């Protein structure tokens, strides 16, 4: 009996996604022979039963075609074949999955994104994907769900400012062994990708439209999901003694905001996610120069990742107690701005000499970390920020840096990152002696040493005895090209990483 499950557009509607198109996915136990393009998989071992069955049905034409193409089934290798006359398809894509043992959910998601981009570029409207027993393993539901997840992530586009946005997308039918199990796995991923889309759109939006107040307004829309939103304005921030956060926002008319988004899915001690939310970073009086300043609208990507994760946890109805604390400000130049040489007083009580006004992220995070510890007493605290150019020079944009006082958390998060293609590389703590100041307790930049490490060591002063992780995602927030699950614009980095980690631990 044919079983078909069509997925709703609920996650798209809940994402405040600015894209107008949405890929359509149907999971079925029967092949859709009316589709334009058929996609079938082929491992290096050549064990795929469905390929062999189709090849027999098509009188050996598929095998002859892949032999002519010297197709070996390597991962992401594609042989595009004009469909045999006896089929209703126009084309057949034979897609390599590499070695059977290496084809996991992360590989499936990347492949889904790249195949989707190929189909969109070729103006394909409908595609049938055979995912029935592609590996000989019992993981086909998870692989199919993640392939669809990758396709949908790649489909997301931010094109609100284009006169003629590209609205073309693809309707998919997946031939799977267990459509109900596949749909259940995809439903959870659909909730997570709603959080990713939110983070991407917040990050990609231009700075004049995505101010601290507008970011707060976007967060307020999540209350219908059972998320408690609290906002502290500049006067409240100042009253609490959060002098670092208050000072960074002085250069902008809006001032700073502290945004708290709390999803309480359990009575356990909370896990606090702390996000840097600099909606535009001019560098202040230590002003940035060069073309990179155009990317500084994305300096709030850490806060976007935190808000997207809290949303994802609410949509998945996770049994987790997660509080997101986001330090929002625009680092601008005006007569009210912090000047190099100023001394600020943090809520922790430590004074900080501002040697460089472009090292503002650690200042706003310091007060946000203090707030999370004081008012939520979290079991674990993880901060995420586009913090240092030094991280980009050390690791590029394929990895984010992870620095921590807890080896177990590093292992958990690094493993989670591998599962979702958001990779982490550990850097050490140290060089605290370089943060000394002659007139204050701390300098906001190190006098020497590796910049990513000295920035993390500054933040360590505000972690207390809490198990703490710092993630520096500088270079990971924006991409200019489509690749794997990513489309141009904000990446939403961190949402899938945190969601995978929270749901698995």
Model-derived regions: residue spans:
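Gram-negative bacterial Sec-dependent N-terminal signal peptides
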Residues: 1-22
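Residues at the start of alpha-helices and the adjacent loop-to-helix junctions
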Residues: 2-3, 7, 104, 187, ...
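Generic detector of short alpha-helix boundary/capping microenvironments
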Residues: 3, 10, 27, 83, ...
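Generic structural signal for beta-strand residues in well-ordered domains
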Residues: 15, 31-32, 315
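Short amphipathic alpha-helical segment within the helicase RecA-like ATPase core
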Residues: 21-270, 274-277
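A generic structural signal for tightly packed, nonpolar segments enriched in small/aliphatic residues
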Residues: 216-505
């Amino acid at each position: 009996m044919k079983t078909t499950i069509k997925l709703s557009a609920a996650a798209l509607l809940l994402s405040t996604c600015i894209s107008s198109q949405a890929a359509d996915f149907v999971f079925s136990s029967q092949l859709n022979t009316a589709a334009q393009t058929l996609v079938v998989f082929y491992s290096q071992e050549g064990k795929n039963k469905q390929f062999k069955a189709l090849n027999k049905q098509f009188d050996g034409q598929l095998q002859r075609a892949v032999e002519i193409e010297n197709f070996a089934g390597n991962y992401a290798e594609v042989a595009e074949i004009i469909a045999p006359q006896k089929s209703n398809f126009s084309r057949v894509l034979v897609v390599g999955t590499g070695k059977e043992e290496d084809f996991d959910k992360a590989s499936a998601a990347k492949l889904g994104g790249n195949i989707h981009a190929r189909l969109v570029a070729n103006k394909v409207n409908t595609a049938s994907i055979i995912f029935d027993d592609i590996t000989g393993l019992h993981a086909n539901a998870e692989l199919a769900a993640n392939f669809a997840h990758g396709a949908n992530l790649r489909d997301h586009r931010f094109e609100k400012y284009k006169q003629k946005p590209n609205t073309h997308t693809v309707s998919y039918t997946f031939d799977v062994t267990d459509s109900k199990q596949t749909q259940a796995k995809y439903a959870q991923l659909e909730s997570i990708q709603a959080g990713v889309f939110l983070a991407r759109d917040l990050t990609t939006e231009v700075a004049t439209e995505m101010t601290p107040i507008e970011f707060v307004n976007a967060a307020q829309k999540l209350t219908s999901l059972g998320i408690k939103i609290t906002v502290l304005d500049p006067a409240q921030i100042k009253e609490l003694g959060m002098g670092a956060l208050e000072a960074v926002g002085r250069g902008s008319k809006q001032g700073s905001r502290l945004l708290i988004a709390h999803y309480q899915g359990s009575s356990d001690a909370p896990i606090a996610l702390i996000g840097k939310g600099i909606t535009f970073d001019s560098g202040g009086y230590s002003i940035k120069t060069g073309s990179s300043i155009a990317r500084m609208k994305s300096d709030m990507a850490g806060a976007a990742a935190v808000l997207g994760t809290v949303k994802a946890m609410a949509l998945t109805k996770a049994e987790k107690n997660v509080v997101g604390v986001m330090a929002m400000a625009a680092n601008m130049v005006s007569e009210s701005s912090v000047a190099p040489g100023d001394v600020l007083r943090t809520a922790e009580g430590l004074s900080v000499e501002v040697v460089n006004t472009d090292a503002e992220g650690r200042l706003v995070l310091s007060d946000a970390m203090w707030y999370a510890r004081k008012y939520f007493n979290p079991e674990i605290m993880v901060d995420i920020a586009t913090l240092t150019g030094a991280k980009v020079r050390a690791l590029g944009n394929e990895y984010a840096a992870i620095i921590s006082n807890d080896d177990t958390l590093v292992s958990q998060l690094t493993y989670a990152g591998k599962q979702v293609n958001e990779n982490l590389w550990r850097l050490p703590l140290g060089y605290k002696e370089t943060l000394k100041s002659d007139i204050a307790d701390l300098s906001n930049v190190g006098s020497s040493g590796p910049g990513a490490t000295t920035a993390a060591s500054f933040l360590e002063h505000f972690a207390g005895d809490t198990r703490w992780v710092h993630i520096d995602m500088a270079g990971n927030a924006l991409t200019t090209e489509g690749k794997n699950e990513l489309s141009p614009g904000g990446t939403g980095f961190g949402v899938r990483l945190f969601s995978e980690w929270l749901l698995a631990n």
